[in-house]
Amino acid sequence: MDVTAGEGNEGDTFWDPSNCTGTPYCPPRCPRFVDKFGEGLVIRPYEERDWDALNEMYRDYAREHRSMGLPPVGDVYIADWLTGLVDHGRNFVAVDGDRIVGHITYVPREGPEPELAVFVHQDSHNRGIGTELCRHVIADAAAAGLDALILHVAKENRRAIHVYLGLGFEVVESESTDTKMRLDLDQSVLAKTRTTPDVGERPGVRGVGQ
């Protein structure tokens, strides 16, 4: 299944967006992303053609990196779970060459405070992909006029909690194994996560490399 990040010469699937000024027709956050090692990826909305590649990412997801029972294990359980997310949620994927290496969703897509969940394949950890996926969803949800995003994270996952706090989430409830966090989606949040100009604006790209 071809899920390449972009088009161009053979073997060239990425262009550097650092000098792009954007257009009024760009999405809330630029899909082009350079990771911590200078490698280019694309983060874009999920498409039907991504089904097989996304299933493959989860089939190869290491069990020791699962948290709070997710992602599920086994082809049937993975497919059922993904069907629900695709049918009822708003989904984005991180594409590295011809592979999907990350996935984020918020469900339900029409809810005023939908729940966010993000997963990055273990071979692509420590590249900043999970954080960038979160920024995409935050920008998308804020632009859609949603009130807030919530998430649940294992209490012992201090690294993830630290990332979410850095993105503006606040702890609203903490139990023995589960921490609930919430992000208010006001205009200041949209300004911080947006990397394309609003209609009528002509600034350079804002936030690239954050």
Label the model's feature ranges:
Residues 120, 126-143, 162-166:
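Conserved acetyl-CoA-binding loop-helix of GNAT-fold acetyltransferases
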Residues 131, 155-175:
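Conserved active-site alpha-helix within GNAT-family acetyltransferase domains
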Residues 141-154:
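Conserved GNAT acetyl-CoA-binding A-motif
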